[in-house]
Amino acid sequence: MTNSPAPTTSGVVTRFAPSPTGFLHIGGARTALFNWLYARHTGGKFLVRVEDTDRERSTQAAVAAIFEGLDWLGMKSDEEVVFQHKKADRHREAVQQLLDTGRAYRCWMSVEDLALAREAARAGGPALRSPWRDAPPPNDPTAPHVIRFKGPLDGTTLVDDLVKGPVTFDNAELDDLVLLRADGAPTYNLAVVVDDHDMGVTHVIRGDDHLNNAARQTLIYQAMGWTLPAFGHIPLIHGPDGAKLSKRHGAQAVGEFQDMGYLPEGLRNYLARLGWGHGDDEVFSDAQAIEWFDVKDVVKAPARLDWAKLNFINSQHLHVAEDGRLADLTLKALQAQGAPLPDDAPARLLATVPQVKVGAKTILELAEHCAFALKVRPLALEEKTRNQLTDETVDRLKRLRAQLGAVPVWGLSELEVLLKSFAESEGVGFGKFGPSLRGILTGGSQAPDLNKIMTALGREESLGRLDDALASRA
C-alpha cells in the first residue's frame, strides 16, 4: 500500500475521526479502511481528524497508539491532521450564528428539572424540550447555562444512507440537543458538523451506531445553510458467536494483531471482507480493493470476526511477501521474545524463510518454523533421535554423508534426487534413515522436507551437524 497522497480527480473527501480515549480498535481500523478505499477508488482525499474535545478522557498515549496503528496499516491522511479541540473558537462562532438566526437558544434548566425531563423522555414521554426554548431570559442572564439547538417540533428528517437506504426520523422524537456546555465547550454533534463542513468532507462513512446522530447533524447542517454530505453507516463487527465484540473474543487493538504476527496487507484484506466483498474473491491486493470498492456495496448486517478466515487470508499474503522483509519481521519477533540468537541470525533467516514460509500463517508461526536453522552446533539430540541411531543406521548415514559431500550443486531439486537415489541404492525405504537424519539436522524442531531443511542450512552447516552426530556415536 502506498502512503503517498492520491491525485485528486474528483471532489470526494472522506475522513476518519477517532476519539483518543483508547487504542485503535479493529472496528475503527475497518472504518478508516473503508474511508481510505473509497477516497482512492474515486480519486478523492482521505483525511484524519482527532476528536479530542473530551479533554479529560483524551490522552497523548491514545493519540500515539492511533497513529501507530494507522501508520502500520498504511493509511495516512492526505492533508495535515486536524485536532478538534483546537477548533473550539470556530465551533462557538457557529453556535453564535445559530443563536442569531433563531435556531439555537440559551437554557437555564436546573439539574433537578433536567433530570426529571430526561426521566420522562426515557419513560416514553416527549423528547426533551427546555421551557427556556421560547421563554425570555431570567433576571440574571449571566447565570450558568447551556446553549441548545432549536429543532423542529414536527415533521420528519430523512437520512438517505448509502448503506442503510432511506431512514426517516420523527422530529418530535429528536430532543433539543446541547451545542455548548455551561463551560463553553462544544459538544460532539456540533463540532462534527462544523469540522466536516470546514474540511470539505463530502462522504461521512462510519459505524451504524452513529445513525441516530446523522438525523441530528442533518438538522444542524440545514440550520447553518450548508450542503449535506453523503452518509454511509457501516455495520459493526461482532464476535464469532454473534455477540458484541469484547475482550473474551480475543485481540481487539490493531497493535495486538501486529504483535500476533499478522501482516498489514493481510489484516487490510481481511477487514475489507468484513461487511464488503467482491463476488467470491477472498484474497486480493490493495490495487484490486481500490478498483472494486464502493460504499454502496457494504452489507447492512453486522460482520462476524472469523479467526480461521483471517489466518487463511494472512497466510496467502505471507506466502507471496518478499523474503527479505519476512526475514526482518521474523528477526524482530524473535528479538521481542528474548530468544537467544546467533550472530549470523539475519543471514540464516534469509536462507530459511523461502523454504518454510508456505507452511506459516503468521510471522510468529514463521519464527517457529525457522527455529531449527538458528540452533548452534553441536545440537543436543532428542532421546528419540539417539535411539534411532543404531549401528546399522549410523553406517547408512555415513554412506549418505559421503554422497552429500560430493554433490556438485547444493539445491532443492538436486538434494531431492540424491535422497531418492540413495534410498534406492540402499534398497530401503526412506523411513530407515529419514527420521534420524531429520532429528540430527533440526534437533527435533518443527521443520519442512529434508531437502528444504538442507537447502536452508546450506552445505557447510548441514554436513557439520551430521558430522557432529556421527562423531558422537564413534
UniProtKB/Swiss-Prot annotation:
EC number: 6.1.1.17
Binding site for ATP: 247
Catalytic class of the enzyme: ligase
Gene Ontology terms, MF aspect: ATP binding; glutamate-tRNA ligase activity; tRNA binding; zinc ion binding
Entry-linked InterPro entries: aa-tRNA-synth_I_cd-bd, aa-tRNA-synth_I_codon-bd_sub2, aa-tRNA-synth_I_CS, aa_tRNA-synth_I_cd-bd_sf, Glu-tRNA-ligase_bac/mito, Glu/Gln-tRNA-synth, Glu/Gln-tRNA-synth_Ib_cat-dom, GluQ/Sye
Gene Ontology terms: biological process: glutamyl-tRNA aminoacylation
GO cellular component term of the entry, any: cytosol
Alphabetized Gene3D superfamilies for the sequence: 1.10.10.350, HUPs (3.40.50.620)
Tree of life domain: Bacteria
Keyword vocabulary terms for this entry: Aminoacyl-tRNA synthetase, ATP-binding, Cytoplasm, Ligase, Nucleotide-binding, Protein biosynthesis
Motif ('HIGH' region): 18-28
Catalyzed reactions per annotation: tRNA(Glu) + L-glutamate + ATP = L-glutamyl-tRNA(Glu) + AMP + diphosphate
Motif ('KMSKS' region): 244-248
Compartments (UniProt record): Cytoplasm
NCBIfam families referenced in this protein's UniProt entry, alphabetically: gltX_bact
Record text on subunit structure and interactions: Monomer.
Function comment: Catalyzes the attachment of glutamate to tRNA(Glu) in a two-step reaction: glutamate is first activated by ATP to form Glu-AMP and then transferred to the acceptor end of tRNA(Glu).
Entry's family note: Belongs to the class-I aminoacyl-tRNA synthetase family. Glutamate--tRNA ligase type 1 subfamily.
Protein's UniProt name: Glutamate--tRNA ligase
Organism: Caulobacter sp. (strain K31)
